[in-house]
């Protein structure tokens, strides 16, 4: 998890390690007769594998990996681990273009955690809040952005106050900054690019402990600028992504698509710089 969230060469390192990790946890589960600790570790590995393979172009495996994470989480009987696995299932449903199913699934999962919140720990509020963030994005994809806004500005924001920034329980990176990032994402997906860019100016990436969250946010902002034909701003934000994680342009197709679009339509005043950047990230030549 630390490599995935922190290191510039996260794709090559994690993809190289994943096959061995999966084999080891599968062996451990059976060698220890499905013990809670072995199942906890297996669930964690499959929750990690889902976003890694999704961004590396194997989104078709999201459902299978999330299902494995849930199967092992349920064997532990730990409601927080089950909640984290439910978040992974919800994300897989969004990837598979099933927002209605995702919304129902993660909403029910969040409701099951509510009895724990009266004296809840930051970890419990983090998992609960992560489920709400997934639900908010599902709302906008089902055509109900107002409900998504209510989730973000209400219970998600309140839960984030109980967690604070700089935390990363169960790989969910939940906290005030991630709520703000999802607010930008929701407005962008709702077609409100002006509002999305205005809100993006208020996001402090310095307190976000996840490289994936930071680069995804920068992609979202770049895409908003692309829709407003501000190609210079698109280039600036893609350069910011490259400085943080050069491998993004090797593995993430949407990033390459943004560069390809820039190459086609960049104005003469900075077209040469766009071509130089495209060559550097491997889109040209």
Where do the model's predicted regions map?
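Conserved binding/catalytic microenvironments
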Residues: 1-285
